[in-house]
């Protein structure tokens, strides 16, 4: 019987799974829409929803709890400044999962997980300026 089994293991050890959700949640907060496999999207949804709920509550302790789960300072700032205000009226249900067909290489079922009422301009944002050594730039 499957009583008390709360999460999928996704064929990963616990540390790998934790890192996967940290990276995917940071990407979802940054781009507000990502494409992944359906089981990963279904497992990511409660992880991100809890982060947004922490951000809505605000406060230093909730910010530290979110930082422990997210590990990305810039996305934490976006989470607490932008997303908390955007979803202040909404009681849960901050994400949407849309099935997106099958991957050609291995026929894995794909899904798009996105934030509800998302910012269309956030999709495809780059990671910021690339670090360039000024000495090499001055010689050119």
Curated annotation (Swiss-Prot):
<dbReference type="GO" id="GO:0022625">
    <property type="term" value="C:cytosolic large ribosomal subunit"/>
</dbReference>
<dbReference type="Pfam" id="PF01196">
    <property type="entry name" value="Ribosomal_L17"/>
</dbReference>
<keyword id="KW-0689">Ribosomal protein</keyword>
<comment type="similarity">
    <text>Belongs to the bacterial ribosomal protein bL17 family.</text>
</comment>
<protein>
    <recommendedName>
        <fullName>Large ribosomal subunit protein bL17</fullName>
    </recommendedName>
</protein>
<dbReference type="GO" id="GO:0003735">
    <property type="term" value="F:structural constituent of ribosome"/>
</dbReference>
<dbReference type="InterPro" id="IPR036373">
    <property type="entry name" value="Ribosomal_bL17_sf"/>
</dbReference>
<dbReference type="InterPro" id="IPR047859">
    <property type="entry name" value="Ribosomal_bL17_CS"/>
</dbReference>
<dbReference type="InterPro" id="IPR000456">
    <property type="entry name" value="Ribosomal_bL17"/>
</dbReference>
<dbReference type="GO" id="GO:0006412">
    <property type="term" value="P:translation"/>
</dbReference>
<feature type="region of interest" description="Disordered">
    <location>
        <begin position="120"/>
        <end position="140"/>
    </location>
</feature>
<keyword id="KW-0687">Ribonucleoprotein</keyword>
<comment type="subunit">
    <text>Part of the 50S ribosomal subunit. Contacts protein L32.</text>
</comment>
């Amino acid at each position: 019987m499957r009583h008390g089994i709360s999460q999928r293991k996704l064929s990963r050890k616990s540390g790998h799974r934790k890192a996967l959700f940290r990276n995917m949640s940071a990407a979802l907060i940054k781009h507000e829409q990502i494409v992944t496999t359906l089981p990963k999207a279904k497992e990511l949804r409660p992880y991100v929803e809890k982060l947004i709920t922490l951000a809505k509550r605000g406060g230093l302790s909730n910010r530290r709890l979110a930082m422990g789960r997210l590990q990305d300072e810039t996305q934490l700032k976006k989470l607490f400044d932008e997303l908390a205000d955007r979803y202040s009226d909404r009681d849960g249900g901050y994400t949407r999962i849309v099935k997106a067909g099958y991957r050609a290489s291995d026929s894995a079922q794909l899904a798009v997980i996105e934030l509800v009422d998302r910012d269309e301009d956030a999709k495809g944002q780059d990671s910021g300026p690339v670090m360039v050594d000024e000495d090499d730039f001055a010689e050119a």
